């Protein structure tokens, strides 16, 4: 378990054959290794059901559909549109407004459990991570960036 991005920076991809027919990513996680490997076919797997649903999402929907859904949720819930560190904001009320918008959207997600909303939530959650409590509710706090 861990961040494979560091391994990629250290040259992991260069260790792979140049012509890969089928790349099997058994413990894919974020799929960063798969996304940085050229192959004719990919098999991506992970034990986490939420990640599996994301893999299906990316296969099922085109980028514009996903982006339009994210934009609609940003507008609907008043989520931050700009990418700004919270500590750079002069207006402290704006920080609270964005934090409350995130919490409202998180609450909505926990009631409806839509994978497109799950993906959107991760943009705004702390360190773009996800975590669930014992009841299965998404419980990551709002991230340090207003839009991450």
Where are these regions (language model features)?
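Class I S-adenosyl-L-methionine-dependent methyltransferase module
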Residues: 40-148
